[in-house]
């Protein structure tokens, strides 16, 4: 099975850039009126030619969002489980070179914080950690996710890159969603941003 990285590396970015920049107002209008958005139409909506259509883009986005999710707004609260990190990224407050006090919540801390969040009426929780497999990795998640799952109707997590089997295990532990943020997919820029990266 091809990974996301494999597929990403196969893309011809010079060709994509030329195609995006070559789109016209007519291409944008066609894309705005299309019922489906194939890649070529999406390129039109991302192109400089689309800059004069921001209001129409916003209206289309709102229609599609309401069609998909209805008229609901959900709020979540982040629970910072740990700011330990084994990486040194130029853009991140958790970066290992930052001289800050490090804290990893234990069972009592988590119980206290989650009770306070529930008292405020929130039912959707986003768990946040730095990237430190040894101290805030799967063993830590196995210990603490089941108790949190019992208290919240939605449990999501921003987490370091894991193996596919570990993502499946997080789901079994009660996680509804996982977010892994990649600040850039441009490999030359990534090297500049990630001074030390244990997942590269």
How would you label these PLM feature ranges?
Residues 1-16, 42, 59-68, 89-100, ...:
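Short charge-dense sequence patches
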Residues 44, 52, 82, 86-88, ...:
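A broad, structure-centric signal for solvent-exposed, well-ordered loop/edge residues
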Residues 70-109:
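Canonical Radical SAM [4Fe-4S] cluster-binding loop centered on the CxxxCxxC motif
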